[in-house]
UniProtKB/Swiss-Prot annotation:
Pfam families from the UniProt entry: NAD_kinase, NAD_kinase_C
Superkingdom, natural source: Bacteria
Chief location of this protein within or outside the cell: cytoplasm
A GO CC term attached to the entry: cytoplasm
Record's catalysed reaction(s): NAD(+) + ATP = ADP + NADP(+) + H(+)
EC number(s) on file: 2.7.1.23
The protein, known as: NAD kinase
Similarity comment text for this entry: Belongs to the NAD kinase family.
The protein's role, per its UniProt record: Involved in the regulation of the intracellular balance of NAD and NADP, and is a key enzyme in the biosynthesis of NADP. Catalyzes specifically the phosphorylation on 2'-hydroxyl of the adenosine moiety of NAD to yield NADP.
HAMAP family (alphabetical): NAD_kinase
InterPro entries from the UniProt entry: ATP-NAD_kinase_N, ATP-NAD_kinase_PpnK-typ_C, NAD/diacylglycerol_kinase_sf, NADK
Active-site residues, as the UniProt record annotates them: 74
Keywords: ATP-binding, Cytoplasm, Kinase, NAD, NADP, Nucleotide-binding, Transferase
Source species of the chain: Campylobacter jejuni subsp. jejuni serotype O:23/36 (strain 81-176)
Length: 286
């Protein structure tokens, strides 16, 4: 993954917007700003039906772009981060709506950001993703990445989930309840937080197991280190990656999850303050 970005030689920047929302006005403003620096803005083909700008499929967009802008909310950025890992490209999150935990500023603030960016005034953070290995009954292994979390929940919401967790073939824990969240530090402020899981600093090399509505008062979230791989077994349950990809657990004989060696480069303003964002979003202090 990129350790730095050569801000002096940026030629092409890709842009992907939140789906099913017209952001043509915001796109044109970004194009106008980037043209000052002789940088071409290219679009994901589904980001605009009207604008006369170069458009590409997602894979081609990543191939030709020096980095990619996510214009939308945290959900838009999360899906892009998994793709960014494939192409070793960085992602910049600009929010179109409410401030997110991952998207730093609005389009109205983009001019100031890029003025600083092209002078080398920015920072790169590289949060780790989860690796998910799904082995089917024929022994074929499907490897997936999760930026935020992997959630195991009951297929039939009227019944209780029974989830067993193993490490090195020894039972590590057993959960009865509505489900189980396996979250990254970046995802600790998402569903994990709603389930009373801990907030873990984004760049920590760890992941979190958080039970959802456990039927036992003694079950509590636990933070596990990088290198600690778990195997999850549960019948009649659904495994969901980042709220976007669903798999029936009955279709697989083995599902293993752990913190990946892969991370994604996120571009931030130099003065970004993670704890100030927490304070604003969670209404800490005055």
């Amino acid at each position: 993954m990129q350790n730095k970005i050569d801000h002096k030689n940026i030629k092409t920047i890709g842009l992907v917007t939140r789906p099913n929302v017209s952001l043509d006005k915001e796109i044109l403003k970004l194009q106008s700003i980037l043209s000052i620096y002789k940088v071409e803005l290219v679009l994901f083909k589904e980001s605009s039906e009207i604008l006369d700008l170069p458009k590409y499929g997602l894979d081609d967009l990543f191939k030709i772009s020096d980095f990619v802008i996510s214009l939308g909310g945290d959900g838009t950025l999360i899906s892009l981060c998994r793709k960014a890992c494939e192409y070793d490209k960085a992602v910049l999150g600009i929010h179109a709506g409410h401030l997110g935990f991952l998207t730093d500023f609005k389009v109205d603030e983009a001019e100031n950001f890029f003025q600083a960016f092209f002078q080398g005034e920015f920072r790169i953070e590289k949060p780790y993703l989860l690796s998910v290995f799904l082995e089917d009954k024929q022994g074929k292994i499907l490897e997936k990445l999760a930026f935020n979390d992997v959630v195991i929940s009951k297929n039939n919401q009227a019944s209780m989930a029974h989830i067993e967790v193993f490490r090195k073939e020894k039972k590590f824990n057993e959960y009865f309840g509505d489900g189980l969240i396996v979250a990254t530090p970046a995802g600790s402020t998402a569903y994990n937080l709603s389930a009373n899981g801990p907030i873990v600093y984004t760049l920590a090399q760890a992941f979190i197991l958080t039970p959802v509505c456990s039927h036992s008062l003694t079950q509590r979230p636990i933070v596990l280190p990088k290198g600690f791989e778990i195997e999850i077994m549960a019948k009649d349950c659904i495994l969901c990656i980042d709220g976007q990809e669903n798999y029936k657990m009955n279709d697989f004989k083995s599902i293993k999850v752990g913190l990946s060696d892969k991370n994604v480069a996120l571009i931030h303003p130099k003065n970004r303050d993670y704890f100030q964002i927490l304070k604003e979003k969670l209404h800490w202090g005055n």
